[in-house]
Amino acid sequence: MAALTDFAFMYRWFKNCNLVKNLSEKYVFITGCDSGFGNLLAKQLVDRGMKVLAACLTEEGAQKLLQDTSHQLQTFLLDVTKSENVKEAAQWVRDQVGEQGLWALVNNAGVGLPSGPNEWLTIKDFVKVININLVGLIDVTLNMLPMIKKARGRVVNMSSSGGRVAIFGGGYCVSKFGVEAFSDSIRRELHFFGVKVSIIEPGNYKTSILGQEALESRMKKLWDRLPQETRDSYGEEYFQTYTKKLVNLMRSAEPRISDVTNSMEHAIVSRSPRIRYNPGLDVKFLYLTLAKLPTPVTDFILSRYLPRPADSV
């Protein structure tokens, strides 16, 4: 048993240390670089000497990133929900990489709000999140694929523990389940072209995607706009308890986001990237377990976390 453990450790160590050659000559395109995971990953890859093409949503975010990095990084303003903008970004990347192609695409752009009980949300709330987290990701990928195939490169897609088990309502978990399915399907198709696809499934990390103040404010707006009949069926206590639980979840978030960006970096620079990365103890010991349990058992556990509505049976 000890020998098997040692062998497994050595095998994992070898895979982690077995890096791609000539990294300084390779281009990486990252979406969502204004802050959070994308911002830190861009800086890490610049430190490695790679050529980073960073897409930011705002001019302010782009300028700040340029100030914090070297000439090896270039920025492009990109809203992934606008197809024309995505096409422009693809042409810009094509102009930068030339015949060598694009080594890695990192689909990181995403939002978490609006989230909440599904009945409290509108179809526009769902569409807003899904358009950014899933449809935009697919649009960017499809436009970049010819360049990635040319380089025999990688696609790294940001999913979530919420892509394995739906822990709350709204478009977030719906979109992340979609990211998982899209990633699985293109991984199998692109295997024949020498392209590798990795999925990042982080747990609860402290980023701007779900800020505490924005969360409390958003929950109050959701509650206030509900019809009186719906509010009566849930009750004020349900609203207060549900909001408190979400806020506590955000307060317990892990601030060390380098756990996540290190996983993303490994997917880019390793010759043997993993199919799925699960940074965070909560993912490893809670969410993945919940995802693998029989559905009635998972339902029982998660329903005990939810408050009881006033009009419950």
UniProtKB/Swiss-Prot annotation:
Disulfide bonds: none
Modified residues (Phosphoserine): S185
Residue ranges crossing the lipid bilayer per the database entry: none
Location within or outside the cell: Cytoplasm
Binding annotation for NADP(+): 29-53
Record Gene3D superfamilies: NAD(P)-binding Rossmann-like Domain
Gene Ontology molecular function terms on file: all-trans-retinol dehydrogenase (NAD+) activity
Keywords, comma-separated and alphabetical: Cytoplasm, NADP, Oxidoreductase, Phosphoprotein
PANTHER family, per the entry: SHORT-CHAIN DEHYDROGENASE/REDUCTASE FAMILY 9C, SHORT-CHAIN DEHYDROGENASE_REDUCTASE FAMILY 9C MEMBER 7
Family (UniProt): Belongs to the short-chain dehydrogenases/reductases (SDR) family.
Protein name, per record: Short-chain dehydrogenase/reductase family 9C member 7
Organism: Mus musculus (Mouse)
